Amino acid sequence: MSTPYTPAPQIFNLFKVLAVSLALIAAVEYFKYGTRINYEWFHCTPVMERVGGPDSSVLKIWARGGPSCDKRGEYKTILKRISRDYEPNDEHLSFCIKENMSVDPVHYPIHEDKGEPGYIAYVGYDSDKRTVDELCEGTTVFHF
């Protein structure tokens, strides 16, 4: 007569899998914490300056950052900021993006002096369209 099969307890395997999972989660959180402290080193940060007085909706936008913030990163950051900050359902939007041709496409501003921005955008609602048109003279003005 044989004894019935009884599976071995798997509790130790469960603890091993749980420990490895928690270690991976901790590693990801530590990386996120480290990059948050040095965010500017890894990403482009938008810089905004109001143009045309306190009641104006017109902003001058450019991007700054560390080595990964080249012209492509600046462009993406500027467009992302325009699309998030302005609501075209409230009022139509006009903007232009001027390229600084004296800045190389791939530039690595490692030091505190980031140099000139590769792109500068002027954006505002159509109630301030005249100001946007003046600032964007010589470039294409886009509308949302």
UniProtKB/Swiss-Prot annotation:
Ranges of the Lumenal topological domain: 33-144
Predominant location category: endoplasmic reticulum
Any GO MF annotation of the entry: sphingosine N-acyltransferase activity
Keyword Endoplasmic reticulum found: yes
GO biological process: ceramide biosynthetic process
Keyword field: Endoplasmic reticulum, Glycoprotein, Lipid biosynthesis, Lipid metabolism, Membrane, Signal-anchor, Transmembrane, Transmembrane helix
Ranges per topology, Cytoplasmic: 1-9
Regions crossing the membrane: 10-32
Cleaved signal peptide residues: none
Localisation per UniProt entry: Endoplasmic reticulum membrane
Positions annotated as glycosylated: N100
Membrane-related topology note: Single-pass type II membrane protein
Listed GO CC annotations: acyl-CoA ceramide synthase complex; endoplasmic reticulum membrane
Family to which this protein belongs: Belongs to the LIP1 family.
Quaternary data: Component of the ceramide synthase complex.
Function per UniProt: Component of the ceramide synthase complex required for synthesis of ceramides.
Protein name: Ceramide synthase subunit LIP1
Record lineage: Eukaryota, Fungi, Dikarya, Ascomycota, Saccharomycotina
